[in-house]
Amino acid sequence: MMVSKKKMGRPSKLTVSLEKAKAYLMGEYKTVGDVVPNIAGLACYLNISRSTIYEWSSSSNVEFSDIVEGILALQENKLLNSGLKGEFNPTITKLMLSKHGYADKQETELSGKAGGAIKTDNKISIEFIGIPQRESAN
């Protein structure tokens, strides 16, 4: 009769961190003083480096990657809603939202030296053609 072997030993740091990361996403971030969930806050909460978080989320661990994506989505949502309500500092909100792809509208105007026109080699000719006069009926 074959006896199956059970894995014995301590769970990996990733396994333990997965449960804690879920708790952080589900609201535990508030209890540690974070206004919005963020990667640095998660790193402090798990007592690991940010680079470890990025390594775990880019590896084949889909569950941890989903938690990190959830944290970023919740952060974006809280920034938008609290920023619109005036609950967050506008400058900080704008800075943090830029990490989510938001940006001010930028207009670009081209000008030459001292703000003048840009010189080109294109020559444009305009030819004025007179209107033929009608003969009078007198």
From Swiss-Prot:
Question: What's the superkingdom here?
Answer: Viruses
**One family name in Pfam for this protein:** GP3_package
Q: Which InterPro entries match?
A: GP3_package (IPR032066)
Stated name of the protein: Putative protein p17
The source organism is: Acyrthosiphon pisum secondary endosymbiont phage 1
